[in-house]
Amino acid sequence: MPNVKLPDGNVKHFEAPLTIYDVAHHISPGLAKAAIAGRVDGVLVDTSYLIKEDCSLIIVTEKHEDSLEIIRHSTAHLLAQAVKALFPSAQVTIGPVIEDGFYYDFAFERSFTPDDLSLIEAKMHELAKANLSITRRELPRNEAIQYFKDLGEEYKAKIIADIPENEALSLYRQGDFEDLCRGPHVPSTGFLKAFKLTKVAGAYWRGDSNNEMLQRIYGTAWADKKSLEEYLFRLEEAEKRDHRKLGKALDLFHFQDIAPGMVFWHPKGWTIYQELEHYMRNRLVDFGYQEIRTPQLVDRSLWEKSGHWANFRDEMFVTETENRHYAVKPMSCPCHVQIYNHGLKSYRDLPLRLSEFGNCHRCEPSGALHGLMRVRNMVQDDAHIFCTEDQIQSEVAMMLELVQSVYKDFGFTEIKYRLALRPEKRVGSDDVWDKAETALKLAMQGRNIEWVDAPGEGAFYGPKIECSLSDCLGRIWQCGTIQVDFSMPARLEASYVAEDGSKQTPVMLHRAILGSFERFMGILIEHYAGKLPLWLSPVQAIVLTISEKQNEYAEKVRKTLQKRGIRANFDLRNEKIGFKIREHTLQKIPYLLVVGDKEVENCQVAVRTRDGIDLGVMTIDTICDTLTQEIIRKGSI
């Protein structure tokens, strides 16, 4: 009879098989009432799961880390049940859990409207309030296919037809609705208390643009209403901060159908871009990098040698001229090896740090493009370090120092690190992998960095560190990468003469900090809601006149600011000063310098910030010094 080991180490002995719900009830009726699911010997199962043998058990409640995925998956089924109740001719397809929520795809003769979503959500609340029991049963594959065909659910039958014949399938029923699912699910619909449908969009069946278009309804679900409200607030804030809206409102950039996924930078947006590049260039010089430039169009022979032609061909833009095939480079790594290979290298030349603001193109699907966050033409802050195995740790430690310093200057202090470790299929010996993984760990320990191991998630050619930023809304953005590469240098015949005179292959370290300039700018715009730090603002100060009598003085102030390296402008229009202040505040200009007759007489300016703070009257030299010091301090403000 089963002995059940609980998380606190206690072992409960039972005289007969029993369900997880029964175990919870044995501990306390309150726990039984709160139980959502269980984890038996590490596997998530329903509370109705029958325990027959000795096992370890964790009872999952709303407070457990596993609860949200179960709640969201169950809510996706609740959505499908509501849609079928309101629109019986709709066919169900798939309904997975995604970050912060779920979606469900439906085949329906028309697009769902916002009014439809309101009706569906109301029906979901009705079904949740009914507290319908959720039960599980198994069916053989062929029976399941016929079952769904009889229901008129052709898409579901097609999904099951792709499953191996000998596999038993589980179905979950709630009320008169039953759906295919591995589970687990909450015990009843009454556990689903806090959810919201967020939007509807089109989606191709099985993600193939050659297939029919389905209707995808997105939603979010949480354990309680407070968490839901907090999430919806963050969602509302994210909508306000959408870099695409702010890019238009602040006249930074735009996109056009004539060049999908490629940015048209306006003067102010390009100013920010140039400031980013200037900043990164200076930091790289400080850390001993040599900047290079490599071609945009490269013969396919190089991509074949590097392995990109076989594995990345569909994402490359390819052209043909004079009977030769070329690819627009999707990444800079193979070209950097060509520069390394130009001339004999000795161990004394290592480490060799090469950097490039690499202009890359990738043929991303049009449906995946998303403002600056997902583009086809991006500039990456690429760097490749060629070194010996013994130099990996010191080089990675130096990279981490640079990563932390750069992110701090941009105002990001909460960084998450992930170490992707060896996969099953890999190149290189275990000894080499041991050495590389240990070097990465020691480098992070040396910087007092905490990280999460990701076993099996490294590339086949080496382990890597992923660096992710947390923005003001708590969203995580993976930007930086430090990747060890044992493969490409050998594939492209890179070598150096070792101290003993032998010919050796260097290790190649791929390194990016921003990731791509475009995406990083999108992150910055949303993080700061367009109110970029002074040093990044395209216009740092604007001089506003009260009347045309101050025009000459305003020009003098602007020129003085510009001579001090401050990006300044003026507004001489014959408009009320309140109108000017409001307009330039909406443009997120950090400092508004108002000049009237009194300021002209005393060679001063009245200083206001974009947040409406009155800093009083200052001399021109004082405001120049104030702004210059703030610019120098960068993200530490």
UniProtKB/Swiss-Prot annotation:
Disulfide cross-links: none
SUPFAM superfamilies per record: Class II aaRS ABD-related (SSF52954), Class II aaRS and biotin synthetases (SSF55681), TGS-like (SSF81271), ThrRS/AlaRS common domain (SSF55186)
One GO CC term on file: cytoplasm
Keyword Cytoplasm: yes
Keywords tagged on the record: Aminoacyl-tRNA synthetase, ATP-binding, Cytoplasm, Ligase, Metal-binding, Nucleotide-binding, Protein biosynthesis, RNA-binding, tRNA-binding, Zinc
SMART domains in UniProt: tRNA_SAD
One GO term (biological process): threonyl-tRNA aminoacylation
Locations listed in the record: Cytoplasm
Cofactor(s) this protein requires: Zn(2+)
The enzyme's E.C. designation: 6.1.1.3
Pfam families assigned to the protein according to its UniProt record, in alphabetical order: HGTP_anticodon (PF03129), TGS (PF02824), tRNA-synt_2b (PF00587), tRNA_SAD (PF07973)
Domain TGS: 1-61
Protein residues bound to Zn(2+): C333, H384, H510
Bilayer-spanning residue ranges: none
Catalytic reactions of this protein: tRNA(Thr) + L-threonine + ATP = L-threonyl-tRNA(Thr) + AMP + diphosphate + H(+)
InterPro entries: aa-tRNA-synt_IIb, aa-tRNA-synth_II, aa-tRNA-synth_II/BPL/LPL, Anticodon-bd, Anticodon-bd_dom_sf, Beta-grasp_dom_sf, TGS, TGS-like
Cofactor binding remark: Binds 1 zinc ion per subunit.
One Gene Ontology term of the molecular function aspect: ATP binding
Catalytic as annotated region, ranges: 242-533
Source species, domain of life: Bacteria
Function statement: Catalyzes the attachment of threonine to tRNA(Thr) in a two-step reaction: L-threonine is first activated by ATP to form Thr-AMP and then transferred to the acceptor end of tRNA(Thr). Also edits incorrectly charged L-seryl-tRNA(Thr).
Family according to the record: Belongs to the class-II aminoacyl-tRNA synthetase family.
Subunit: Homodimer.
Protein name stated in the entry: Threonine--tRNA ligase
UniProt source species: Legionella pneumophila subsp. pneumophila (strain Philadelphia 1 / ATCC 33152 / DSM 7513)
Name of the gene encoding the protein in the UniProt record: thrS
